[in-house]
């Protein structure tokens, strides 16, 4: 039980190249927390968090090119990785074995996200389409067309109603999953949308852009609730805390920032990375944050709860 933000652990030389994506998983055998990292060294690594440190469990081989996105299923036992090799791979977190490989087509699968029911996997594409694959079958089931530019980021709302996509031209689209219809187009940013995240109650959407700003949108009314500045450069990743009180952001300014959602202010800045920070995530109970970056390090931070 911590009363302040602090760095708990640094895993140096975690990969042999930049680490662009990170997630938390769970080992259902012993209940231990896992950290999953995806790197431009073509590897996905699974780390066990125990005794306040990370121990590598597996280095998962299979991708032919850099791994740019990883996501853990809400059920917690399956992990997906997408790579510049245009393949999505599904992995069993219990055994470290590959479940299947999905050919995402002639376009590279940039970001990958599980649906809240763990049944589907969404990935953005070059041609402005979000492709939805069945987790069980590995087959493409349908597409959502933004009729826009290359999609860099995607997110499902936790209630399963919406899917949001962020494009290289700064346009955000929100789809109704049940009907496949495009509900809202948000034009608040002028530069690429690197990341977006829904609040746990699905009411808010937070977006991160190369323009250096973070925006908070009211999902239902598609209205801009706040614009936050503080990072000195591109904002590369955003993620909500499980209780919706905070969200965390990472940037090419080498910092990780924690924001108070209701006060719309930054409450803490971590300056522990030596290079741009590509990935950041809260664990399932909000007690810890993990971050990864170009410095090939994984950092775990303690949060007051």
Curated annotation (Swiss-Prot):
Entry protein name: Superkiller complex protein 8
Reported function: Component of the PAF1 complex (PAF1C) which has multiple functions during transcription by RNA polymerase II and is implicated in regulation of development and maintenance of embryonic stem cell pluripotency. PAF1C associates with RNA polymerase II through interaction with POLR2A CTD non-phosphorylated and 'Ser-2'- and 'Ser-5'-phosphorylated forms and is involved in transcriptional elongation, acting both independently and synergistically with TCEA1 and in cooperation with the DSIF complex and HTATSF1.
SS bond list: none
Gene: skic8
WD repeats: 14-57, 62-101, 104-143, 146-187, 188-227, 230-269, 272-305
SUPFAM superfamilies: WD40 repeat-like (SSF50978)
GO BP of this protein: negative regulation of myeloid cell differentiation; nuclear-transcribed mRNA catabolic process, 3'-5' exonucleolytic nonsense-mediated decay; rescue of stalled ribosome; transcription elongation by RNA polymerase II
Coiled coil: none
GO cellular component entries: Cdc73/Paf1 complex; cytoplasm; euchromatin; nucleus; Ski complex
Alphabetical list of Pfam families matching this protein: Beta-prop_EML_2, WD40
């Amino acid at each position: 039980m911590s009363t302040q933000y602090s760095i708990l652990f640094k895993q140096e030389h975690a990969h042999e190249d930049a680490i662009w994506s990170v997630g938390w998983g769970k080992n259902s055998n012993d209940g231990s927390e896992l950290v999953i990292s995806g790197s431009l060294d073509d590897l996905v690594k699974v780390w066990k968090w125990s005794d306040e440190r990370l121990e590598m469990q597996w280095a998962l081989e299979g991708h032919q090119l850099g791994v740019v996105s990883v996501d853990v299923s809400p059920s917690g036992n399956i992990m997906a990785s997408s790579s510049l090799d245009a393949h999505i791979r599904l992995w069993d977190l219990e055994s470290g074995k590959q479940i299947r490989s999905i050919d995402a087509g002639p376009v590279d699968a940039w970001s990958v996200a599980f649906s809240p029911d763990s049944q589907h996997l969404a990935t953005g594409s070059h041609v402005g389409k979000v492709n939805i694959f069945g987790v069980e079958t590995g087959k493409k089931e349908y597409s959502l067309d933004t009729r826009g530019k290359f999609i860099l980021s995607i997110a499902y709302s936790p209630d399963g109603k919406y899917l949001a996509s962020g494009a290289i031209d700064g346009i955000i689209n929100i789809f109704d999953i049940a009907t496949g219809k495009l509900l809202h187009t948000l034009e608040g940013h002028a530069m690429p949308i690197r990341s977006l995240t829904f609040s746990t109650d699905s009411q808010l959407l937070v977006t991160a852009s190369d323009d250096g700003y973070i925006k908070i949108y009211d999902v239902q009314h598609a209205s801009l609730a706040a614009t936050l500045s503080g990072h000195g450069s591109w904002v590369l990743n955003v993620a909500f805390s499980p209780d919706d009180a905070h969200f965390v952001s990472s940037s090419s300014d080498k910092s990780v920032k924690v924001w108070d959602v209701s006060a719309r202010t930054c409450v803490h800045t971590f300056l522990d990375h030596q290079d741009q920070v590509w990935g950041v995530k809260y664990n399932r109970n909000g007690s810890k944050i993990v971050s990864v970056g170009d410095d090939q390090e994984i950092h775990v931070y303690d949060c007051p709860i």
